[in-house]
C-alpha cells in the first residue's frame, strides 16, 4: 500500500468531514487547477487548501520506508510542490497565534502575486518585440532568468513602498531598464568611443598641440604673463603715486585739483620708470601667396598663449569658419599683431607683408607709404618659403633683401614651411637650401645655412619646440621662437638708446571729429610720451597739446618707443599722414641738403624723372637735384647710367624742394633710413642711410 493510501485511511478513521479538510489527491489536483485557471499559467499560485494539507501531513508521525515506490500521480504532485517552493514567496505564513487577524488576508496576497506575474509577462513581451525590431542587438543587453526577474521585481516593489512612506529620504535614481520596457521606450546602443571631427572642434581645426606645446603654453600663461601683468600694475601704481606727489608739491592754487592725469613727470622719472617696461622688437613676416604665412602666424600665437580660445575659434586655419586672420586680429589700423615670448619676456610685434609692394604694379601712394615706412622701423624679417615650391617668389625676396642690406638690416631668417608633407626628409631640406642660396647669391651675397629653419605651421612643429622624432635626429639648431628671442636680445640695447632720445612720432591715420578736433593714430619712434604733453607738429613747428592718450598696450601711464597710440589733437592746417610730431622745436634738424649712402635697383634710374624722398617714417619731400659720387667725382644722374650698372651702391648728394627733418646715421640707424620713390609712387628707385646734413 502506498504512503498516500495509508494517509487516506488514517484520515477516514478519525471521521473528519471531507468537506472541511479535502485531503484526497483528486481534490488537491482539482484545487490546483482551479486556482491556476484564475491566474496566468506561468507560475503556480498557492491556496488555502495547500496550507491545510501541509499542516495535516506535518502533524502525522508515520514514517515511510525509503525504498517504497511512489505512483505517477504522487510524483506529479511532488514535482509541482517542488516547483512551487523554488520561487520564494513574499507573503508571510499565517501564524497560528492571535496575531493572524492583523496580517494581510491571503486572498490579497494572492491577487498581488497575480499582478506581479502579469507585469513579468509584459516585460518579456516587450523584450521579444525589441529583439525583432532591432537589426543589430545591443552588446550591453542583459538576459535575466526567472529568478533574476523575480528578484528585480521584489527590489522595485520594496523601493516603491519606501518611497511612499518616506518620500523625502529616498533619492530618485535614473529610470531602470525595467521601467523603460514598461513604457515601451527602446534602448539605445551604447558607443564605446565618441569621435569628434576636427572640422567641428570648438578650439582647433588642425592637429592638437603636442605635450611640449601644452607645457610651454602653461608656462607662458602662468609665469611670464602673470609676472609681467603684476609688473604692469606695479608700474601704473608707481606712475600714479609719482603724479600725486608732484601734484602736492605744486603751488597752493593747484592743490584743489584732485585729477592727477594731467600732471607731467620729469624726464628723469620717466627714465627710471621705463626700466620696468618690457623691450619691444618689431618683426616683418614676408612670403609669396599660399606659402603658409597666416598658418604660421596663427599657430605661433596659439602656442605661446597670446590668443584666448574665443579668438581662436574665429580664425580660418583653426576651424571650419571661413574668416581671414586679418579680419579677426584687428588690433590697430596698421594691422600690427602684438605677442609676447615667454623665454625672455619680450613684447614683439609682427605684420604680414605683401611681396609685390615694390613692383611696378604697386597700389596707390597711401598704401605704398604705409608699407614702405615699415622698413624704417623693423628689426627682424621672417621669410616663408613653401618646401613644395621653393623657387616661387624668390624674385621678390631678392629685392627685399637688397632693400634690407641697404638699410643696414641684417637680422632675417627663412622659415621653410610644410615640411611635414615631405616627412621631414633631411636630404630634401639640404637640396632646397642649396638651391635658394645659389639663386640669391648674385644679388644678395652668401646666406648662412643657420638662417634656414624647417617648420610645420599646421602642426606647430619647430615653432616653440621640435616635438618630432625624425626632425630631432638631424636638426640641432634653435626653434623659430628661440631665434626670435636671440634677435630681441641684440635689439635690446638699441631700444634703450631710443628711450633717451627726444620724442618723435608720426601720424599714420587721421579721423576728423566735431568741435575742430582730430582723432589720430601714431607710432612712437623715440623718446616717451605722456598725456596732456605739449608737442610741435610738422616742419612749421605748430604748437599743440595731445589729450585722451590710449594704446593697445597694457596701461602704464605713459608710452615709450615702439608703442602705437591713439589720441586727440586740435585740427591744424596741413595735418596729414606721415607728418612728424616732436616734443621740442630743436629736436630734429630740418634740412634741404644731405649726403646719403644709397643702393639702386637695376635700371630704376630714368633721365629727367623726379623722385620723392621718404624719411622719418612717412615724412617726404620732392627731390629736385641728385648728384652721385663715382670715382671720387660728382656727376649728374644722366651722366652716370653706366656707372650705376657696375656699382649699385654709391654716395649721393640730394637737394630737396623744401626742408624736412632728417637724422644722421650716427644718431641712430633706424631714424636715418631714407627711401627714393618714383614720381607716381609705384616703384622703389633707391634706399639708403643719411651720413651728414647741410643747411
From Swiss-Prot:
GO terms for cellular component: cytosol; nucleus. InterPro entries: P-loop_NTPase (IPR027417), T_Tr_GTP-bd_dom (IPR000795), TRAFAC_GTPase_members (IPR050100). This is Uncharacterized GTP-binding protein P8A3.05. GO terms for biological process: endoplasmic reticulum unfolded protein response; nuclear-transcribed mRNA catabolic process, 3'-5' exonucleolytic nonsense-mediated decay; nuclear-transcribed mRNA catabolic process, non-stop decay; translation. Residues 32-47 have a biased composition (Low complexity). One of its GO terms (molecular function) is GTP binding. GTP binds at residues 287-294, 357-361, 417-420. Pfam families: GTP_EFTU. PANTHER family: TRANSLATION FACTOR. Residues 278-492 form the tr-type G domain. Belongs to the TRAFAC class translation factor GTPase superfamily. Classic translation factor GTPase family. Residues 1-112, 242-262 are annotated as: Disordered. The keyword Nucleus applies. Keywords: Cytoplasm, GTP-binding, Nucleotide-binding, Nucleus. Its main location: cytoplasm. Residues 96-107 have a biased composition (Basic and acidic residues). SUPFAM superfamilies: P-loop containing nucleoside triphosphate hydrolases (SSF52540). It is found in: Cytoplasm; Nucleus.
Amino acid at each position: 500500500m502506498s504512503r498516500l493510501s495509508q494517509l487516506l485511511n488514517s484520515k477516514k478513521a478519525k471521521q473528519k468531514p471531507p468537506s472541511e479538510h479535502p485531503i484526497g489527491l483528486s481534490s488537491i489536483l482539482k484545487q490546483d487547477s482551479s486556482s491556476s485557471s484564475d491566474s496566468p499559467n506561468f507560475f503556480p499560485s498557492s491556496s488555502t487548501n495547500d496550507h491545510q494539507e501541509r499542516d495535516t501531513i506535518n502533524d502525522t508521525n508515520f514514517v515511510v520506508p525509503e525504498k517504497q515506490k511512489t505512483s505517477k500521480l504522487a510524483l506529479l504532485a511532488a514535482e509541482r510542490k517542488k516547483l512551487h517552493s523554488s520561487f520564494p514567496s513574499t507573503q508571510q505564513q499565517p501564524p497560528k497565534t492571535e496575531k493572524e487577524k492583523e496580517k494581510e488576508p491571503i486572498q490579497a496576497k494572492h491577487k498581488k502575486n497575480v499582478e506581479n506575474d502579469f507585469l513579468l509577462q509584459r516585460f518579456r513581451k516587450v523584450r521579444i518585440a525589441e529583439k525583432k525590431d532591432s537589426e543589430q542587438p545591443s552588446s550591453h543587453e542583459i538576459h535575466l532568468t526567472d529568478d533574476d526577474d523575480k528578484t528585480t521585481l521584489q527590489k522595485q516593489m520594496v523601493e516603491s513602498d519606501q518611497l511612499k512612506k518616506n518620500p523625502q529620504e529616498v533619492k530618485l535614481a535614473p529610470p531602470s531598464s525595467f521601467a523603460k520596457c514598461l513604457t515601451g521606450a527602446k534602448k539605445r546602443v551604447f558607443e564605446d568611443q565618441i569621435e569628434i571631427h576636427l572640422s567641428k572642434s570648438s578650439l582647433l581645426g588642425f592637429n592638437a598641440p603636442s605635450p611640449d606645446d601644452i607645457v610651454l603654453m602653461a608656462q607662458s600663461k602662468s609665469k611670464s604673463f602673470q609676472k609681467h601683468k603684476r609688473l604692469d600694475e606695479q608700474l601704473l601704481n608707481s606712475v600714479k603715486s609719482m603724479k600725486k606727489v608732484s601734484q602736492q608739491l605744486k603751488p597752493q592754487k593747484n592743490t584743489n585739483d584732485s585729477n592727477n592725469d594731467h600732471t607731467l613727470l620729469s624726464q628723469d622719472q620717466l627714465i627710471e620708470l621705463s626700466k620696468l617696461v618690457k623691450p619691444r622688437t618689431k618683426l616683418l613676416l614676408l612670403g609669396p601667396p599660399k606659402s603658409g604665412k597666416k598658418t604660421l602666424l596663427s599657430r605661433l600665437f596659439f602656442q605661446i598663449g597670446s590668443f584666448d580660445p574665443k579668438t581662436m575659434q574665429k580664425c580660418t586655419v583653426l576651424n571650419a569658419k571661413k574668416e581671414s586672420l586679418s579680419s579677426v586680429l584687428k588690433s590697430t589700423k596698421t594691422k600690427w599683431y602684438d605677442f609676447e615670448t615667454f623665454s625672455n619676456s619680450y613684447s614683439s610685434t609682427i605684420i604680414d607683408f605683401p611681396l609685390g609692394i615694390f613692383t611696378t604694379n604697386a597700389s596707390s601712394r597711401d598704401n605704398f607709404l604705409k608699407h614702405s615706412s615699415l622698413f624704417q622701423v623693423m628689426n627682424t624679417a621672417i621669410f616663408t618659403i613653401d618646401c613644395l615650391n621653393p623657387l616661387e617668389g624668390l624674385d621678390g625676396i631678392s629685392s627685399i633683401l637688397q632693400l634690407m642690406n641697404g638699410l643696414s638690416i641684417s637680422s632675417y631668417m627663412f622659415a621653410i614651411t610644410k615640411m611635414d608633407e615631405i616627412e621631414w626628409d633631411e636630404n630634401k631640406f639640404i637640396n632646397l637650401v642649396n638651391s635658394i642660396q645659389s639663386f640669391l647669391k648674385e644679388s644678395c651675397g652668401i646666406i648662412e645655412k643657420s638662417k634656414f629653419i624647417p617648420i610645420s605651421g599646421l602642426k606647430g612643429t619647430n615653432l616653440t619646440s621640435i616635438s618630432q622624432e625624425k626632425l630631432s635626429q638631424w636638426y640641432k639648431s634653435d626653434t623659430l621662437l628661440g631665434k626670435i628671442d636671440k634677435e630681441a636680445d641684440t635689439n635690446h640695447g638699441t631700444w634703450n638708446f631710443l628711450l633717451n632720445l627726444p620724442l618723435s612720432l608720426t601720424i599714420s591715420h587721421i579721423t576728423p571729429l566735431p568741435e575742430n578736433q582730430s582723432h589720430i593714430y601714431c607710432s612712437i619712434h623715440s623718446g616717451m610720451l605722456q598725456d596732456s604733453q605739449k608737442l610741435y607738429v610738422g616742419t612749421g613747428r605748430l604748437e599743440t597739446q595731445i589729450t585722451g592718450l590710449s594704446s593697445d598696450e597694457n596701461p602704464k601711464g605713459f608710452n615709450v618707443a615702439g608703442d602705437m597710440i591713439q589720441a586727440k589733437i586740435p585740427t591744424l592746417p596741413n595735418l596729414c599722414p606721415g607728418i612728424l610730431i616732436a616734443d621740442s622745436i630743436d629736436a630734429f634738424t630740418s634740412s634741404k641738403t644731405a649726403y646719403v649712402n644709397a643702393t639702386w635697383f637695376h635700371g630704376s634710374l630714368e633721365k629727367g624723372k623726379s623722385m620723392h624722398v621718404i624719411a622719418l617714417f612717412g615724412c617726404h619731400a620732392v627731390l629736385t637735384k641728385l648728384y652721385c659720387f663715382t670715382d671720387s667725382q660728382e656727376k649728374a644722374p644722366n651722366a652716370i647710367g653706366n656707372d650705376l650698372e657696375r656699382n649699385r651702391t654709391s654716395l649721393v648728394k640730394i637737394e630737396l624742394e623744401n626742408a624736412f627733418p632728417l637724422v644722421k646715421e650716427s644718431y641712430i640707424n633706424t631714424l636715418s633710413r631714407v627711401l627714393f620713390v618714383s614720381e607716381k609712387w609705384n616703384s622703389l628707385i633707391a634706399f639708403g642711410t643719411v651720413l651728414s646734413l647741410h643747411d
